[in-house]
Amino acid sequence: MLEIQNVSKTFNAGTVNEKTALNGLNLKLNEGDFVTVIGGNGAGKSTMLNAVAGVWPVDCGKIIIDGVDVTRLSEHQRAAYIGRVFQDPKTGTAATMQIEENLALAARRGKPRTLRIGITRAEREQYRELLKSLDLGLENRLTARVGLLSGGQRQALTLLMATMNKPKLLLLDEHTAALDPKTALKVLTLSAKIVEENHLTTMMITHNMKDAIKYGNRLIMMHEGHIIYDVSGEEKKNLQVSDLLAKFQIASGGEFANDRMILS
């Protein structure tokens, strides 16, 4: 479903600020894989997701989604294959528009659009049923402005919008990091439910090692732009946070310096 082949990306090449973010990265995801991604600051996690999404061109290598080489496609062109949820709940929705208008825009992604958003009765009923699955009461607030929603409600709506067309690949970029623990748990549980029910191939960056172990069928750890640990199946299920810390120290030769990841 997704192949990252020998991908490298360096920022500010040839300057004193030169930084190699991805260093010959190789990764293959099978259809339906739910991969959690961990690593310290600057490990290349978000750069990897941005490279896959086409936010910036890679220096070398190939990116293939569902058998299509998308390496030279723009971010807009890749949007037909990808759904994405960012860390900031304000990203991915239009605050001044109604909930149903946001859903209509998401439903028509990749299709011809007009300046006017006309929503049929059938579409409105479909949106109501989708929102009901969130169990947040939003199905009764279709005409509410999105800017009035809480961070958790808005992130849940963004998740719904990113997945309603069943993308080939779902990218979750620390999408619960800005939420309080109780709300984060609800959004994570909802994410896992949507991924499983729709059999979505997913990559989820998380700062929480416990969540990385709990969710998904596979876990990868990144360091200095490449993958240093890749585990799945029963071995992943039996992992402890202490195991991940030990693996990091062995593979990288250093201590894990992100207390937020260790203590979460």
Regions found by a protein language model. Give the residues of each.
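Conserved ABC transporter NBD signature motif
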Residues: G61-V68, Y229-V231
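H-loop/switch region of ABC-family ATPase nucleotide-binding domains
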Residues: T206-H207
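Helix-to-loop junction immediately C-terminal to a conserved catalytic motif
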Residues: A53
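The feature captures the beta-strand-to-loop junction immediately N-terminal to the Walker
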Residues: I38-G40
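A short, flexible loop at the N-terminus of ABC-type nucleotide-binding domains that lies
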Residues: M1, T10-G24, S74
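ABC ATPase NBD coupling module
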Residues: T15, D69-G83, T91, R113-R116, ...
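ABC ATPase C-loop
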Residues: A162-T163
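Conserved beta-strand-loop-alpha-helix hinge in the C-terminal portion
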Residues: H226-S252
